[in-house]
C-alpha cells in the first residue's frame, strides 16, 4: 500500500445535473485533480514527468462502485492512494466520503505510462513511482470480459476541439458523457450507476465522429464507443433507482 492523500471540496452548481447530483464525469475530473496534487507535492508532477522523460500518464480501466452520488453544495472528501504497480500497470484507489465519513463512491483506476511522441506504452520507471511508496506486485488486476453488442441502439457524436486534452486525445471523462447520453434523459432522470467497468481500447482521433452504442437488459447495460471502424472504449454498467429524499 502507498501514501494516501486527501482533499475536501464542495460540489459547485455547474457540476450538478438535473437531479441535483454531481455528474459522474466530474467525479473523475475532481479525483484526477486530487491525484495530480499528490504527485506535485511528491515531486513527480505530470509536467516534470513530461519534461524529464517525455512520458504521460494515461488510464486504461476504471472500476467504479457508487453507493450514492454527492449533491450540489455537499462537502465531500476525496482520498486517493497509489496501491501497487508492475512492469506496465499502476493501480490507484479513489474513495469519496461524505461529511460523516460514509463512503459514497469507490473507484479503482489502472494507469500506464505512454511516450508522448511514439504514443506507445512505456515500462514503469522506478524513479517515477518510488515517491508514492506503493508495492511492486506482479499480479495483474483484470476487468470483466467485454462482449460485442448484437442489437444495439446507437447515436453519433462529433469530437470537438475542447474534448481533447493537452496529450491530444479525448479526455477520459468525455467517454462517460457519450456513454450516459445514449441512455436518454427519461432513464437518467430515474437511475444512476451502481457499478461501472470501463475499458479504454484505442484513442479517438481529433475532429472525427464517434458512435456510442448500448444494449440494455433490465438494470444492466453494455456499451461500445467506436470510430473509423475500430473500438475505442467498452463499458458494462449496473444501474440503481434514485432514492427519493
Where are these regions (language model features)?
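Terminal targeting signals and extreme-terminal segments of soluble enzymes
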Residues: 1-79, 83-245
Amino acid at each position: 500500500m502507498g501514501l494516501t492523500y486527501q482533499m475536501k471540496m464542495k460540489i459547485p452548481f455547474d457540476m450538478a445535473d438535473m437531479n441535483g447530483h454531481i455528474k459522474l464525469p466530474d467525479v473523475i475530473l475532481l479525483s484526477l485533480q486530487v491525484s495530480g496534487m499528490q504527485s506535485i507535492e511528491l515531486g513527480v508532477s505530470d509536467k516534470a514527468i513530461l519534461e524529464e522523460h517525455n512520458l504521460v500518464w494515461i488510464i486504461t480501466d476504471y472500476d467504479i462502485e457508487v453507493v450514492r452520488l454527492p449533491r450540489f453544495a455537499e462537502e465531500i472528501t476525496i482520498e486517493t492512494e497509489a496501491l501497487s504497480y508492475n512492469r506496465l500497470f499502476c493501480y490507484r484507489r479513489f474513495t469519496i466520503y461524505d461529511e460523516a465519513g460514509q463512503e459514497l463512491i469507490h473507484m479503482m483506476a489502472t494507469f500506464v505510462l505512454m511516450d508522448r511522441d511514439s504514443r506507445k506504452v512505456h515500462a514503469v520507471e522506478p524513479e517515477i513511482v518510488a515517491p508514492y511508496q506503493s508495492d511492486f506486485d506482479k499480479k495483474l488486476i483484470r476487468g470483466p470480459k467485454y462482449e460485442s453488442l448484437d442489437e444495439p441502439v446507437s447515436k453519433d457524436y462529433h469530437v470537438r476541439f475542447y474534448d481533447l486534452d493537452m496529450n491530444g486525445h479525448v479526455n477520459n471523462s468525455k467517454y462517460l458523457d457519450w456513454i450516459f447520453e445514449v441512455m436518454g434523459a427519461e432513464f437518467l432522470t430515474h437511475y444512476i450507476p451502481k457499478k461501472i467497468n470501463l475499458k479504454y481500447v484505442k484513442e479517438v482521433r481529433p475532429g472525427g465522429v464517434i458512435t456510442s452504442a448500448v444494449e440494455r437488459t433490465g438494470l444492466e447495460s453494455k456499451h461500445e464507443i467506436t470510430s473509423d471502424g475500430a473500438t475505442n472504449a467498452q463499458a458494462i454498467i449496473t444501474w440503481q433507482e434514485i432514492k427519493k429524499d
